[in-house]
């Protein structure tokens, strides 16, 4: 991929990105040709400067569907709030946490260093602000996240655990990744644009584009592109992706309580 090749450039040379419109010597007809071309990949790369754009046959969701997330006016908001968080493993990378209204992110926090006390305080404060019970909060249970799960008494996400309902996935992370892709393709996922910087937006797009199917196991189970391969392609761990896909956990652990539950249980007549 383009990004991997760029990272292999000679150390004393630098890449300066610019758009074709910034070239004073370019033929105007060339630009018009890019605007009208039916080759979507060429238009995105050469006209809009989206060099990472690729119609990857293994992609679970399209570039356009991912971009619709930002400022999405038709995302699913239910009035039910959740918290999801990817806690950096043993203090490395960033910790990413979000408050959701349905499938729309309404608050976001990034911790450059995973201090569990800061993360726990943030989670508890948001629980109080939005009245979010413990069973509607989840963070990854690997590494540092395990302490947050125990101390806050919230749900723990175990990547390699068994998928729900006996579905044909390699593990829980794969199952939730595919489910997230379904929601993205249905234009149900959203985030308030004023919550993120341009750099974070670009990073989220890159990471969600890594939601790709991978070689099936010998038993035919569906797989996601491995994290090691993702790191090679984008140069970092997909923390944003993991924070997003944990929201899908609640699709398998949400139960509607009937309005007449007391009557059904024989508590009232």
Where do the model's predicted regions map?
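Short, flexible loop/turn motifs enriched in small residues
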Residues: 89-96
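Acidic two-metal-ion nuclease catalytic site recognized across multiple nuclease folds
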Residues: 70, 109-110, 205, 209-269
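ATPase catalytic-site recognition across NTP-hydrolyzing enzymes
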Residues: 23-85, 99, 214-215, 219-221
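Single conserved hydrophobic/aromatic residue that forms the stacking wall/gate
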Residues: 1-10
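Hydrophobic/aromatic beta-strand patches that form the interior of the parallel beta-sheet core
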Residues: 14-16, 83, 155-157
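Mg2+-dependent endonuclease catalytic cores in nucleic-acid-processing enzymes, primarily RNase H-like
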Residues: 99, 103-223, 264-269
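Conserved AAA+ ATPase "SRH/arginine-finger" region at the nucleotide-binding site
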Residues: 16-23
């Amino acid at each position: 991929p383009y990004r991997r090749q760029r990272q292999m450039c000679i150390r004393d040379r630098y890449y300066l990105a610019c758009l074709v419109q910034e070239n004073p010597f370019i033929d105007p007809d060339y630009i018009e040709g890019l605007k009208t071309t039916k080759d979507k990949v060429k238009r995105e790369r050469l006209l809009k400067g989206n060099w990472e754009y690729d119609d990857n046959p293994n992609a679970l969701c399209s570039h356009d569907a991912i971009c619709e997330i930002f400022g999405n006016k038709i995302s699913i908001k239910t009035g039910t709030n959740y918290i999801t968080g990817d806690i950096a493993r043993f203090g490395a990378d960033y910790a990413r946490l979000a408050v959701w209204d349905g499938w729309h992110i309404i608050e976001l926090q990034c911790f450059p260093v995973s201090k569990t006390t800061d993360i726990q305080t943030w989670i508890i404060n948001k629980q109080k602000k939005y009245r979010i019970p413990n069973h509607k909060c989840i963070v990854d249970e690997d590494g540092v996240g395990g302490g947050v799960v125990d101390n806050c008494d919230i749900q723990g996400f175990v990547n390699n655990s068994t998928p729900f309902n006996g579905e044909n996935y390699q593990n829980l992370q794969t199952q939730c990744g595919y489910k997230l892709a379904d929601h993205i393709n249905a234009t149900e996922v959203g985030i308030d644009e004023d919550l993120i910087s341009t750099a974070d937006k670009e990073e989220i797009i890159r990471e969600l584009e890594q939601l790709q199917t991978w070689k099936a196991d010998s038993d035919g189970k569906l797989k996601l592109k491995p994290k090691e391969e993702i790191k090679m392609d984008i140069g970092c761990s997909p923390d944003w992706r993991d924070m997003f896909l944990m929201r899908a956990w609640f699709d398998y652990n949400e139960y509607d309580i009937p309005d007449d539950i007391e009557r059904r249980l024989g508590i009232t007549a």
